[in-house]
Amino acid sequence: MNDFPWLTIIVIFPISAGSLMLFLPHRGNKVNKWYTICICILELLLTTYAFCYNFKMDDPLIQLSEGYKWINFFDFYWRMGVDGLSIGTILLTGFITTLATLAAFPVTRDSRLFHFLMLAMYSGQIGSFSSRDLLLFFIMWELELIPVYLLLAMWGGKKRLYSATKFILYTAGSSIFLLIGVLGLSLYGSNEPTLNLELLANQSYPVTLEILFYIGFLIAFAVKLPIIPLHTWLPDTHGEAHYSTCMLLAGILLKMGAYGLVRINMELLPHAHSMFSPWLLVVGTIQIIYAASTSPGQRNLKKRIAYSSVSHMGFIIIGISSITDPGLNGAILQIISHGFIGAALFFLAGTSYDRIRLVYLDEMGGMAISIPKIFTMFTILSMASLALPGMSGFVAELIVFFGIITSQKYFLISKILIIFVMAIGMILTPIYLLSMSRQMFYGYKLINVKNFSFFDSGPRELFLSISILLPIIGIGIYPDFVLSLASDKVESILSNYFYG
């Protein structure tokens, strides 16, 4: 047990500081913005300090663990802890949220509430990644849904209410399955009901019961990840949300589904996961092809990027279902990699919209001459998204490939077929990304418009773009920086399986 409650402070600090902002006298939008950014920077520094001085990378067990009796009934504890699986996602959450608050500078309407919701979402996400109690995990999972709904409904586009309603129906509906799974695991695991994840990891269940629990959790995480056909909320949500909200959705929210799939389905229910993994592998492969072929048909810029996210999530599903060391490591690396790339693309799409007030690609064109800095950054990050060598996406997808090739679970012919289909998906990716860049930046449409002029990327936007680009290149050149965090934990999870 840790002496100092680092994780409790890290989880509670953003929402507490955000609540304070609501009750203090209104001092203007600029004060609210800088206050929120200072909170995020302080939180990120605190998290980094706590992990640098207290986290041992060669230890696969839970570290910085805390446990406080919360509710006597049902043996409910406030349990926190991190391991190699959660440390990367927590640091990613801090980094992307800090940059998203900086990206939200143009928001002026109800800025106090807007920034409070971003901080509340921050707490919910870090709480989900650091919870070591199943019911606490569920509470944190639900906590971040409310801010996302309000951010969508109040600061979105013309169809924001439709998108927000669709989002909450999908996510709240899937949460019912999550709650049933949580209660089922805790009540039927042993004679003594427990919500402690460490104890539940050592439990065994009747096969039928384990399959039912697995399906319940899978539905909940499939909506968040998302896995087809439960993905339809994502393009609508991204298409209408403010781009700072899109950064949080693409960078962190989707990763919660992948994290839950590894943390609960794979770690707690290994027998059921072994049975379902071939089906997940097929779904992941179809998802790559489906999203990559659907994306070029999207007129809306942000919807096209959203479908690219769905395609990239397919690699995470394949990595998880390979049940191999390289496959799972590649999936974790893809979680971090796409967190940066997805957030960056939505930010640049938003900055372009701020200038031309157009969202449909067939109305754009000829912007490269007027905004060369945004054009350059968008081109580089599009290359990162299509897995250019030297970028983080390339390494992640390559390791997932190795994971499938080395898997002992599948026949050679099925592995060759899966790899062939994945390769087709990787060929389709440059088609929709490069055509998107061509429609936006080349041609003469906007140049020929009378009195056409707008300013290029300012210092704030350039700083944001470069801040996200640096880790993408850094991970691409030296992926072991991320892989070393989770490698021992991955081996620990795979020790429950008979192959890999």
Curated annotation (Swiss-Prot):
Compartments it resides in: Plastid, Chloroplast thylakoid membrane
Record-linked HAMAP family: NDH1_NuoM
Keyword tags: Chloroplast, Membrane, NAD, NADP, Plastid, Plastoquinone, Quinone, Thylakoid, Translocase, Transmembrane, Transmembrane helix
Family the UniProt entry places it in: Belongs to the complex I subunit 4 family.
GO terms under biological process: ATP synthesis coupled electron transport; electron transport coupled proton transport
Annotated coiled-coil segments of the chain: none
GO function term, MF aspect, one: NADH dehydrogenase (ubiquinone) activity
Record EC number: 7.1.1.-
Catalytic activity annotation: a plastoquinone + NADH + (n+1) H(+)(in) = a plastoquinol + NAD(+) + n H(+)(out); a plastoquinone + NADPH + (n+1) H(+)(in) = a plastoquinol + NADP(+) + n H(+)(out)
Protein name: NAD(P)H-quinone oxidoreductase chain 4, chloroplastic
GO cellular component: chloroplast thylakoid membrane
Entries under InterPro entries matching the protein: NADH_Q_OxRdtase_chain4, NADH_Q_OxRdtase_chainM/4, NADH_UbQ_OxRdtase, ND/Mrp_TM
Top-level EC class: translocase
